[in-house]
Amino acid sequence: MLLIPSFTANSNEPPPSKLSLSDLSMAILKSHFFLLFPLLLLHFHTVSFAQTLFVFGDGLYDAGNKQFLSQNRVDASFPPYGVTVGQATGRWSDGSIVPDYLAKFMGIPKISPILLTTADFSHGANFAIADATVLGSPPETMTLSQQVKKFSENKNKWTNQTRSEAIYLIYIGSDDYLSYAKSNPSPSDTQKQAFVDQVITTIKAEIKVVYGSGGRKFAFQNLAPLGCLPAVKQASGNVQECVKLPSEMAALHNKKLLQLLVELSRELNGFQYSFYDFFSSIQNRVIKSKTYTFETGNAACCGTGSINGSNCSAKNVCAKPEEYIFFDGKHLTQEANLQVGHLMWGADPEVIGPNNIRELMVLPLDITVILAGIQEAMAAMRPRQSNIESLYDIKKMESEMDNHWLYQVDKAISFMI
């Protein structure tokens, strides 16, 4: 069963809303309804609800892979991790993580870690693992390339159609930039850009590998303001302010990542995506914690030091994790993960675009073919197309797309199904 969650009270992000067409878009759609409707009906047979979720990333999405790969003690396999749900499961939180909630909203079971060989993978697999990076070869983890390779090795567990209809959820890069900032405290603008380009180029290559295996629907959660993580602030010695360089690197990454997704949507036939502004969501909650139901956005629930930025253990955990954004120095509480899950699932374009995941999962696989035909037939009548060149100006991007009538047809299709 498909679940439609409600939003957490007091959130400034808009809740899911029904389709709102601009006057111009509505006029065009009405006047050309008889031209468009047969085309839409002709292709409705390709529409189906995604029932499979593949997850790639780092500790924010790790459902337990670290405990199967590491030769050392994995903290997430022991209390106080899992304290809110009664047991530690290898998740770096007091309870559920974002992929768990998205699976729930999709109406499927939680997605198991791929290294749990006895698991049921009929609805997908989770390849994410703590400490994962895009670049390099860190020990006891899997880089993005290694995660994608593991997916390729196991892809025959799923049919071609299943892989093409699935959602591919990705969050990775934090550890790359945290390591870079630690090793390069004063890089030039050119050096910063060069490193970001390396990361983005690798992500592009791995997206294309997944695309080559049938992947079409990609959901990206952009990077958090890394300098605001309790672990990073505490290590800097100034716990009252976010550290500039890690957050700056994350913002540069997010800009380039959005540009990449726009580029791929033009280059790869059938490529569809969601881009969630996680950076702003966390930044807003750190600055205005109480607005989002949290008591503090500065300190972690579990750990040692002035803001609990390190060494989370059962001896130093808070009584009410739900009052905190961060459970440990780098990872979110279940409550924060729930809010993020809601936003990714059903928020408006100011938060996630051009589709939220609820819309992405029902988009026809050949929607680009439909829209391309309509676009060609009515090119002279449409408003200007959006020209997304500024990477991290999501509100500008979505404002322009909201005036693009083809974008409205896209939305109309998903809501008519």
UniProtKB/Swiss-Prot annotation:
- Please tell me whether the keyword Signal is annotated for this protein: yes
From which source organism is this entry?
Arabidopsis thaliana (Mouse-ear cress)
Q: What is this protein called?
A: Inactive GDSL esterase/lipase-like protein 25
Q: What happens when the gene is disrupted?
A: Defects in endoplasmic reticulum (ER) protein export and organizational defects in the ER, including aggregation of ER around the nucleus. Increased sensitivity to salt.
Which superkingdom, per the lineage? Eukaryota
- Catalytic center residues: 331
Transmembrane feature ranges: none
Entry's family note: Belongs to the 'GDSL' lipolytic enzyme family.
Q: Where does it sit, as one GO cellular component term?
A: endoplasmic reticulum
Q: Which gene encodes it?
A: MVP1
